[in-house]
Amino acid sequence: MEIPILLDQFYLTFGIEKYATWRPEKAPHAIICGATGSGKTYFTKLLLGKIALYAENCEIVVCDFKNDDDYIFLDGCKHFYRYMECQRGLETFYQAFQSRQSGEDKTRNMKVLLFEEWASYLNSIDKKEQDNEKRKLSNLLMLSRSFNMQVIICVQRADAQYFSTARDNANLIVGLGNLSDESRSMLFSSYRSEMLPDRKQGTGYMLTSGTNLTAVQVPTISNMEKLHKVVREAVNR
């Protein structure tokens, strides 16, 4: 499955809309990084909509630790968790993973976990709980692809301390806006010298499986209500 997710800026300079694509089965799991105002959440909602459209019977779990109005359209949905409910959301997804791993669940429709503001969530709980939550995330990043499960983590900074040893298992990296030197080094280490400091809101860089650095632009969502509808359906499954 190949999902068109971002516009390639090189082609846009010639007036050509060519999409950079993501193949989750080949490059599992994603980290989306960007400061406040970079367009990170706008892109994340677009990505969820694309997944819901392209992956038949996809089930999405959304953990929104920010608890602002960005995901208010999901209020009342079966697998929507806000603020401290996010702990239950992660556990729900982790149990679904364990059910597939143990053979209890034989289904293989795509299941997706989106966790907004993972680092802020970890900083809100005590050390013992942090270690337990990071262990779950590490297991998901390392093992869940085989069971058609994907993890999408949104952060302002992708410090290794928030991912235990499994950050490199996220194969789709999207950095929006002008990332700090530290974030470029952490996520785009081999290409940081090629990243220009001219990124505006909704523009950035994409890396797939550690290669093919691409300057990208987030497409405009032409029908927000349609996007909300397909995402709601997936979060309610």
Can you describe what each PLM-predicted range is?
Residues T211-A215:
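Short, mixed charged/polar active-site loops
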Residues T220, M224:
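Short, charged phosphate-coordinating catalytic segments
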Residues W118, M206-S209:
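AAA+ P-loop ATPase catalytic core
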Residues M1-V112, A119-N178, F188, L196-P197, ...:
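P-loop NTPase catalytic phosphate-binding loop
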